[in-house]
Amino acid sequence: MTLMKTANQSEATVSGHKIEMHKSGSGPPLLFLHGGGGFGTFDPTASPLAEKFTVYAPSHPGFFGSERPDWLYTINDLAHFYKDMVQELGLEDYVLVGHSVGGWIAAEMAAMDHHNIKGLVLIDAAGVRPEKGEITEVFMVSGDTRLKLGFHDPSQVPSYDVISADPTPEGAAIGHGNMEMLSRLCWRPYLHNPSLPHYLGSVKTPALVVWGKQDAIIPVECGEMYSKLLPNATLKSIDNCGHSPQMEKPDEFNAAMA
């Protein structure tokens, strides 16, 4: 798998740690938190989101070129890190969007303090454990298998040939580091927080839950759970789509976000 960067990359310092920051657009602030595989073929800073919002899209600490704080071990730690970042950047009444693991971080942030969050969008988010289905074990399979699991029909994904190409040695090292950090954050318990469902009932922020119906990594059952646990949530499920609707069904995703 080849890793893709966005077109608007710079650097920011949060609590003394340097992170990659991708920023573009104009309008009210929107914070986009990527999944474990990064942004893939979807660059939020060059998407229709940047036509309505000033989009902030950081690379998570320990991912890509962002520094890895020694104290950061859990998704809850990462949520606190981003709460600090929001404060340091002075973001007011921002829209919070998260995909996969980024959606889990977003849900944790909203559960901590939702008063400064104008809107919440969870895209095929980790964080809750399905009652009937299973979350696929992504740490025990190859990168090629993970990539195939991520899409229902790869032919629908713009530039799929780019992300499916063999990585350079540098890209392979970055990908390995990303997975190492992901396992550090999400291994136990695996890709969920058993306490999170109990916190979500206090989140009054309007929420949109977007899910690919054929998600082979985190089943749509989890999207249904989020839409029930969040008091003001709407579920938008997208047919013939896997784990990353913003990549596999960009038109339908953008319509849902409009």
Predicted features by range, described:
Residues 13-67:
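Conserved HGGG/HGGXW glycine-rich cap/lid loop of the alpha/beta-hydrolase fold
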Residues 104-112, 117-150:
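Flexible "cap/lid" loop of the alpha/beta hydrolase fold
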Residues 14, 56-97, 255-258:
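Active-site loop/oxyanion-hole signature of alpha/beta-hydrolase fold enzymes
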Residues 227-244:
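Catalytic histidine neighborhood in serine/cysteine hydrolases
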Residues 216-222:
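Conserved alpha/beta-hydrolase "acid-adjacent" motif
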Residues 203, 209-211, 215:
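Short beta-strand/loop motif that positions the catalytic acidic residue
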Residues 241-254:
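Catalytic histidine-centered segment of alpha/beta-hydrolase-like enzymes
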